[in-house]
Amino acid sequence: MTIDEMQAVLDELAEELPEVLYKELNGGIVLLPEAKESEYSRRGEGRSDLFTLGEYHHGGAMGNYIKIYYGSFEHIFGYLSDEDMKKELRHTLRHEFRHHIETLAGDKGLIKEDESFLRDYLDGALPVRGRKSGPLRRL
């Protein structure tokens, strides 16, 4: 899937969500071309094993927005069919929207889940998943 094709799919997936979820998401959804290696990635055998698929940002000069990393999707899921890639993209987008909604509500449930995932990852308790990467989690 090219970046232009992914942008079209991302636009379609964004339209699936109710308008109310976009409250205070003033920076929208941004698709970036790069892959983003997680700061927690364990490097071995000349490769990284944890990449960030998406991020939610809130506050600051840019306001609230969601970043999706095309390069990370290609690195991890580049072997998938377009339909399966769309499923992974949908899952990530909804994960980031959950961060947005929980942040507005003052809830830290998903943040705690992500922290638990990272603890397990750093302890080596997670199986390898994906084509070129390790554990899969949308942080």
Regions found by a protein language model. Name each.
Residues H91-L104:
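Active-site recognition of the HExxH zinc-binding catalytic motif
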